[in-house]
Regions:
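Residue-level recognition of alpha-helical structural elements
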Residues: 13, 46-50
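Conserved phosphoacceptor histidine of two-component systems
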Residues: 18-23
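Short alpha-helical segment of the dimerization/phosphotransfer core of two-component systems
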Residues: 59-64
């Protein structure tokens, strides 16, 4: 997850969940938006534009995975 100001993570589970949801919304919106563009204009897009959109979708997917991996790692380290 994105480090909060001051570097301290919320200790309250509800606050942590709210931050996780917030951090996932941006890349998820990117995936949804570019996928819809590809779906609507699949025949009108040239290969370069289609490749750009697919690249952005892939990058957003990697960002979401990283956010979730970081959260999992943080939770596991708290259990130790």
């Amino acid at each position: 997850m994105t480090p909060p100001p001051g570097g301290a993570w919320p200790s309250d589970p509800d606050e942590r969940l709210a931050r996780l949801v917030h951090d996932l919304r941006t890349p998820l919106t990117i995936v949804q938006g570019f996928a819809e563009l590809l779906d609507r204009g699949a025949t009108a897009l040239d290969d370069a534009r289609r490749s750009e959109y697919l690249g952005r979708i892939a990058a957003a997917g990697r960002e979401m995975k990283e956010i979730l991996d970081d959260e999992r790692e943080d939770r596991l380290s708290q259990e130790l």
